């Protein structure tokens, strides 16, 4: 059984962060946080709670770096804390990236850190009362995602939940684009890599049979990276890619492929301070598009999140929660666009198709 998006993720949320969980917690819901602890970190907190006021917290997850490092788990009801459960082990490191996953099960939360089981916490209050997640402390988050094994596939794209709202303005028609000859960097034959759709490699996120994880753990990605897009693209389909640009990066690219053709080529080039978009049909590149509404959104040595939304007439692209561009379809049969390729001077941390 595959996991499906229960709601759109929060991208680069500002800490402290509090946000709603659409529909509340449900059995089978997996909540994944990816971020980095600060080098001076003492502690941070993830709360699953009822409403924004914090008086009722079903699950308080609190890593503390003092005293050798340990993690406190607890529940607060009507403003009163219950007995603490302490795990005298610290799975996080100061100043280092992490992936933290919570799986809601009938009788407990299961917690994974960097794809390894860490702790389980028995429910003290009904989990369906939880409708809010709150994160605070000495950390920086790249995203919070929500995946549900019981949810049907959503073919209608819901409102984006970037921590800062994304605006997708219409692109003025009739704009002329500059034409240049271009060969993409880091080409690799697709037959060299076979990856099953958004399933963890290697290892297993949770021991629950029949529920494979959707989010790759950080070490599982290799560049170039390929994965199929099940059933191809369709209007409202979205793809999210997060990662880190290497400090000495020259370029990288994201390709949406249709067999041997490339329907959408997104190619940040740092030496040119440009983001090139193009289509390749029968090994021939079309006219490049380079214009941007603002400045170059990618930086060497910095993390990024790219959100690509397929609409009926175009792709809409947001970077770090901000609209970057639209790209009108040149290959019209969207369903045949069924492979994602990422390559170049980056480290991948998250892919969601």
UniProtKB/Swiss-Prot annotation:
**Gene Ontology CC: one annotated term:** collagen-containing extracellular matrix
GO MF, any single term: signaling receptor binding
| Keyword Nucleotide-binding set for record | no
The UniProt keyword set, sorted, is: Chemotaxis, Cytoplasm, Immunity, Lectin, Nucleus, Repeat, Secreted
Q: Name one GO biological process term.
A: immune system process
Q: What upregulates it?
A: By viral mimic polyinosinic:polycytidylic acid (poly I:C) and lipopolysaccharides (LPS) in microglia. Up-regulated in macrophages following infection with Mycobacterium tuberculosis.
Q: Could you tell me which residue ranges the Galectin domain spans?
A: 17-147, 225-353
Residues given in the record as a beta-D-galactoside 2 binding sites: 265, 269, 279, 285-291
The protein here is known as: Galectin-9
Q: Which organism is it from?
A: Mus musculus (Mouse)
Gene name on record? Lgals9
């Amino acid at each position: 059984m595959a996991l499906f998006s229960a709601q759109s993720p929060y991208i680069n949320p500002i800490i402290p962060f509090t946000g709603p969980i659409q529909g509340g917690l449900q059995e089978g819901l997996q909540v994944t946080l990816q971020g980095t602890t600060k080098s001076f970190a003492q502690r941070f907190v993830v709360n699953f709670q009822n409403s924004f006021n914090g008086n009722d917290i079903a699950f308080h997850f609190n890593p503390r770096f003092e005293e050798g490092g340990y993690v406190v788990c607890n529940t607060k009801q009507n403003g009163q804390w219950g007995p603490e459960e302490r795990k005298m082990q610290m799975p996080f490191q100061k100043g280092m990236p992490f992936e933290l996953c919570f799986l809601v099960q009938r009788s407990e939360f299961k917690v994974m850190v960097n794809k390894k089981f860490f702790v389980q916490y028995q429910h003290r209050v009904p989990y369906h009362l939880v409708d809010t997640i709150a994160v605070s402390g000495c950390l920086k988050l790249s995203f919070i995602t929500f995946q549900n094994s019981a949810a049907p596939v959503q073919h209608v794209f819901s409102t984006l939940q970037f921590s800062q709202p994304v605006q997708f303005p219409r692109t003025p028609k009739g704009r002329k684009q500059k034409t240049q000859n271009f060969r993409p960097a880091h080409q690799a034959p697709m037959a060299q890599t076979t990856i099953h759709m958004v399933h963890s490699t290697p290892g297993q996120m949770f021991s629950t049979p029949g529920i494979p994880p959707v989010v790759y753990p950080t070490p599982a990605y290799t560049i170039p990276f390929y994965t199929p897009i099940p059933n191809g693209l369709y209007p409202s389909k979205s793809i999210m890619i997060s990662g880190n640009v290497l400090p000495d990066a020259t370029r990288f690219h994201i390709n949406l492929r249709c067999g041997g053709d490339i329907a959408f080529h997104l190619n940040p080039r740092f030496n040119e301070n440009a983001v090139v978009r193009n289509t390749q049909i029968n090994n021939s590149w079309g006219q490049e598009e380079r214009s941007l509404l603002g400045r170059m959104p990618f930086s060497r040595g910095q993390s990024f999140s790219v959100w690509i939304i397929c609409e009926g007439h175009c792709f809409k692209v947001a970077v770090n929660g901000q609209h970057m561009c639209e790209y009108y379809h040149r290959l019209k049969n969207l369903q045949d666009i069924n492979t994602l390729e990422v390559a170049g001077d980056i480290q991948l941390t998250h892919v969601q198709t």
